[in-house]
Amino acid sequence: MAGGTGSPAAIVLADAAASYGGRPVLTGIDLTVRVGERLALMGRSGAGKSTLIGLIHGQAPDRVALVPQAAALVRPLSVFHNVYMGRLDRRSTLHNLRNLVRPARRDVAAVEDVLGRVGLADQLWAKAGALSGGQQQRVSVARALYNGRPILVGDEPVSALDRQQGGRILAELARSHETLILALHDVALALAHTDRIVVLEAGRIVLDAPSAGLDPARLSPFYEAA
């Protein structure tokens, strides 16, 4: 269910700014995301979406499960171990070291369940580096699902998937997390799977509106130069 104005704030940015190499990347960002919202960040390449994702993650790292733009997998390790990393900080060092050599049955079962939700249960023991780009992206999503924190922040989490498969993954993320904040480039997916769209242009918010009141024609100009 979408978060309303009465829902508590999950993320608050007030006049936030960021620069890279002395060059402003984000300026005057005022953004409040409420518990229960499904928000899409959109805009051309270079508009500042990834930087904003970083600021949002930094606001509440202990409440955020992150799907980074690059899958960031440890390629020589198995899919199991890469997904298991989503909870490393909640397990003892001894348990984590033991799982590296002889994974506990309950952990294997939990990871296998999560992989089933992204269509990769049969890849549990495959090396992450042997997977296709789309499979690696789904492993990254599975790691965030396994992490289980209430706010899911994703930087193009389905960019390597076709629209149908991407839609299924976004629906699974919505079922599994209380609040979604997703940088997306696919207008159709954003309209179908979020309830609010925020568009960035040259580091500023130029549109912030309910998805229900928007359509592809309204959003496509922001992508013409993408």
Residue ranges of each PLM-predicted region?
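Conserved ABC ATPase "signature" region
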Residues: 96-123
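Conserved ABC ATPase signature
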Residues: 127-131, 135
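Hydrophobic anchor residue at the start of the ABC signature
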Residues: 141
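Catalytic Walker B motif of ABC-type/P-loop ATPase nucleotide-binding domains
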Residues: 152-155
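Conserved structural motif at the start of ABC-family nucleotide-binding domains
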Residues: 11, 26-28
